[in-house]
Amino acid sequence: MKFGLYFCLALGAFTTVNAQETLTLSECLEMAVDNNLSLQRSRNEIVKGKISISENQAKLLPQVNAVAQINDNFAPPVSVTDGRAYGKAYNVTKTLQYNAAIGLQLQMPIYNQMARTAVEVSKIADRLNQLSYEKAREDIIMQTAQTYYMAQNTLEQIRLVNDNIKRLEELRNITQAFYDNQMSLEVDVKRVNFNIEDLTVQRDNALSMLQQQYTMLKFIIDYPAEKEIKVTDINPGQIDEVNACGLNTGLYELQLLDQKKVLAQKQTKLAKDAYLPTVSLTGNLMYSAYTDKFENWFRSGDSNHWYGSNGIGIQVRVPIFDGFGKRSKIEKAKAEEESARLGYEDAYKKLQANYMNAVSEVNNCQRNYKKQYDNYTLAQDVYNVTAYQYKEGVTSMTVVLQDEMRISEAMNNYLNAYYRYKVANLSLLKLTGQLEQLK
């Protein structure tokens, strides 16, 4: 019975451990790009852009419509003609009460510059949709990486705090033994216990923060919320070199703004094209019938006769005056064109400044990270020496606790420097167009 109970408990523990999946940064980035709901919406916008191109191209193709019409003229109209051939001034002819028509109508653009420019505009808009998707994809990669680094940082904090707690627990055992042998004071035991409790609170807060970061990471990569995940451990002291090869002028922000300039130029052209004439080919193939009684259409005879008519022609439409509406559209389009140009220049100069600051920030954070890591390692060595001296009765509890506080302070500085360094590296990778190197 006991064996079965132990087996079930062991199996449950094994299942719980296995249920927690460790995800690398590369795996998270791949999931984010494939599954993120915001990116799926962006991909849907690309599909809509393709459809918009087809809609505008359809305006350049022939349009054929089938038409059918039937009229009941309660008061039939009359036709008045010259009646002198019949010996009277006017000849008045009354039309029949019912008439019907059925046939095909054709209209095909021969020259319509507005429609052609509209196709070009829709293609530019499609390109903007694609660039917007790439920009959104890049933003998701940045957000995923930052969240992943934050979780790694918190996980490392928990590991280091646990190490500190273990050290203090060993110190407490030694101090308790000293107290039992009247070699230390009760207040020394209380001091150690207080520090242990303080670190335990820090660890609990870090555990809560880690769960929140995991929840955010799962949301970004669209990972099942009910499943547990874990990030990989950091490599303490490792420096990732980034090639500061200059600002990448092909950044998606710049490409988007450049395409907006092109779009504004095309929209100006589209407004000007409204002054141009349009030429269309028209044609029809119709059949008409007339009767004085509706039921005659269901009988054979002279009263049920359909008359055919067909023709082909050219329709020319020349804009003359529209209340200065076209002129206002052209002025507005030119203003949009100038705004797009200024927006591009402003963004380019801002990104250049960001790049220079990013290079400086990476160099500074790299030095600071290495220094803080060395300080943390040194603080551990100093504490180990002090703790050994305390065991030998050479130094006091106060000195040991002071060195332990220095370890905690050095740990916090080291973790903050690590996160700042990783984020600075991430920004530089983005600005230099090397974001795909993330792994």
Write out the residue ranges for each language-model feature.
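Bacterial Sec-dependent N-terminal signal peptides
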Residues: 1-29, 33-36, 436-439
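Acidic, low-complexity, intrinsically disordered peripheral segments
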Residues: 18, 225, 413-439
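Outer-membrane beta-barrel architecture
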Residues: 54, 105, 267-270, 315
